[in-house]
């Protein structure tokens, strides 16, 4: 059986955008926040400056780790710009790594 292969590479994030996400995680995130609230809040940060439809899917969520995937949707190209976001709490400080898939 042949499986689909894809390339994963670490993706650069502009410092001001990274800071907005990390500020949100430090101030608002806890594992008891509803998935819908979390999706809406992070999607709103993500959508700043664009009118694209954003697909957002939470893959893992606990007190010190949040992993989700995003992609942009357009009627012409379907889903594009796929990213994997990994937030990890280390020594009371949130870290963010984003991968382009």
Report the location of each language-model feature.
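Short, surface-exposed beta-strand-loop junctions and turns on beta-sheet-rich folds
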Residues: 74-76
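Flexible low-complexity loop/turn motifs enriched in small/helix-breaking residues
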Residues: 1-66
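Short, surface-exposed coil-to-beta transition loops
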Residues: 51-54, 69, 78-84, 101
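Short beta-strand edge/turn micro-motifs at domain boundaries
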Residues: 83-101
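A short hydrophobic beta-strand element
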Residues: 62-72, 81, 87
């Amino acid at each position: 059986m042949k499986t689909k292969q894809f390339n994963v590479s670490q993706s650069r994030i502009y410092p001001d955008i990274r800071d907005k996400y990390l500020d949100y995680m430090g101030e608002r995130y806890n594992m008891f926040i509803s998935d819908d609230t979390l999706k809406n809040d992070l999607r709103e940060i993500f959508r700043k400056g664009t009118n694209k439809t954003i697909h957002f899917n939470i893959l893992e969520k606990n007190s010190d780790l949040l992993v989700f995937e995003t992609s942009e949707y357009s009627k012409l190209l379907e889903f594009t710009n796929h990213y994997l976001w990994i937030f990890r709490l280390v020594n009371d400080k949130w870290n963010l790594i984003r991968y382009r898939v």
